[in-house]
Amino acid sequence: MKNKCLLLLLFASFPIFSWADETLDSLLHVLDQAILAHDTYVVQRESRIRHLKELAGDVAPNSIERYNLNNQIYKEYKAFICDSAIYYLNENVRIAGNLGDTDREIESKLQLSLLLSSTGMYTESIDVLKSVDRQKVTSHLILDYYTCFDHVYGEMGFYTQDQTLSAYYREISSAYKDSLYAILSPQSEEFMVMRETLFRDRHKYDEALEINDRRLMAAEPDTPQYALVTYHRS
């Protein structure tokens, strides 16, 4: 889990230089530079976290203000210390429950599920999803809801050594992908990422690269988004 968190930190925290048609060696070179600067960015992130915690300590423990500050702390931690990110999401689930705020409770559960599946905690991720009442998922969270199911079952299908289970998990993931395609705009980043991944998995590299070119044109250089798009080219 620590290795996955380190990769998240590298993409979330460090400036990435332009290398639209460079090789994987170029990406590794940039990551090496990021690792060398790691201590500096850790100090900066820890400073932001301390400040947010100080602010959180000055507001009521069961309040929207505390929820929002916890959410900011979670975002700082999620690419830094995953265990702490999980803790603050669970705190927000508790706060939202105490407030009777179903929408925010579901929002935090979906964030938690995605974080858990991104760090290999698939059983825990599915348990969280099972605790979400589909009938209470509002329209602005339905995309996140489908994404969580698609992601966790897609990851399980990829990493399991059992081919029968792999096919089963991939079938579930594919069903949620279909649901996502039905509600996403073809011009959206999420839609294009899914199509690019599909083409790449089917070894249709020209089609995948064409979509990646469009994503790269829309991404601002020296940002985490630009880094992710260029990473997908390697």
What is each stretch, according to the model?
Residues 4-14:
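Sec-dependent N-terminal signal peptides
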Residues 15-234:
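A "functional boundary" signal
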Residues 1-5, 19:
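Short, Lys/Arg-enriched, disordered terminal segments
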